[in-house]
Structure formats: C-alpha cells, structure tokens
Regions:
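A short acidic-Thr-Gly-centered motif at the start of a beta-strand
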Residues: 1-5
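Conserved N-terminal subdomain of the carbohydrate kinase-like
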Residues: 8-9, 17-121
Length: 121
C-alpha cells in the first residue's frame, strides 16, 4: 500500500500589493506642517490571499492561488513575488490591483495611502 500524494492547498481570494516605506522624519516640509520622511527601506509584497499563499508555500506546501490579476505594474509585482513557489490561476481584473502603502518614521505609522481597486472581470 502506498501513501497518497499530498494534495495542494488551494487559496481563493483577493490579492493586493502591500508596500512598506520606513525612514526617519527629522524636519517639516516648508510648504505644509507635515513631516518629511527620508526613506531607508522600501519593501513590497503580496497581501490578502497572496500573503496567505506565499506563507504556506514557504512552509513547503504545494499551493494554488485563484485570484484576479491585471496588466498593471502592481499585478506584475505580485506575479513575480509569488512564482515559482505558488501556482497561479488568474481571473481577469478590470482596473488596477489595489496597493496599500504604509509610511512609517522612526517605527511609528504616519499615514496609509490606498490606490487602485479593480473588480474581477
């Protein structure tokens, strides 16, 4: 008797691109009472269902992700980050992939900027 091959983990859901910008704010902008952040680190990674799929693949699981992706830069960044570890089953996306950008200074959140937000086609 042989053991059955492990089945892949199938993740279905919305993906977004998470961006984290970290730096230091030691001065205010001359044109507004807002901090100026000198960027030390700028990271991007899949978020939402993409993060769940990526973390499972890092643990050695075979993972299939079913999600909507488009032709925009954020979608391509997510594709590049997920392959080769995650097999993608892509649905069409009308519009652009959501991007959530968090800006921190000295380890403290200053602002989150949301962009994009297409709908599955």
């Amino acid at each position: 008797m042989t053991a059955a091959a492990p089945r892949p983990l199938v993740v279905v859901g919305d993906v977004l691109l998470d961006q984290d910008i970290d730096g230091e704010a030691t001065r205010l902008a001359p044109d507004a009472p807002a901090p100026v952040v000198d960027v030390d680190v700028d990271r991007s990674r899949p978020g939402g269902a993409g993060l769940a799929a990526m973390l499972a693949a890092r643990q050695g699981r075979e993972v299939v992700l079913v999600t909507a992706l488009g032709d925009d830069t954020a979608s391509q960044t997510v594709r590049n980050a997920l392959t080769p570890g995650v097999r993608l089953v892509e649905l069409p996306l009308d519009g652009t992939l959501p991007v959530k950008t968090r800006i921190r200074a000295g380890g403290r959140p200053l602002v989150r900027v949301d962009r994009g937000g297409g709908t599955p086609g």
